[in-house]
């Protein structure tokens, strides 16, 4: 990877350490950063352009795409069971991989499925929204809702890798793009004056 032009950050968590790759076009070059010579379940939702999941699947030796309905309602036991059944029907084993391609709902659902399938298999998160890139894809928190109670059933299951491809933001509705930047504003207020200064200038597309 001598020609890699991007940013790599490492979350130092001992045995559960993982890298965060920030690079335009990283999604279609996932094979450069991850082992895809195994069965891969690519989990996405109906609101994410289908081409993103397909780009990942096309790089894998053996893959299946699992598409769930868009929205918070997909963080349910019913949808979780659907994902797990499709993984089982795909004959996934302990050495196989789940890749989430989408926003926070997809990351939470796919990550939790990976955490509990066969007591835990590898998981890669590829966030496609500003909020999930900045916040929910990092930290290893995975969960589903129970009735009206959000994120009450879950697990801490760190991904093996997080791929942040800013090119995917080109298809994100403008209001979702701006709403997700609230987490970046908060980070700037707490720890990064230079970042906060960018928001003060109103230059949010830099």
Describe each region flagged by the PLM:
Residues 56, 110-113:
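Hydrophobic residues within alpha-helices
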Residues 104:
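Acidic-aromatic/histidine active-site loop/patch
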Residues 107:
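Catalytic nucleophile loop
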Residues 91-101, 150-156:
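Short, basic, helix/turn surface patches
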Residues 112-205:
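A glycine/threonine-rich phosphate-anchoring loop and its flanking beta-alpha core
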Residues 2-97, 186:
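ATP/NTP phosphate-donor binding region
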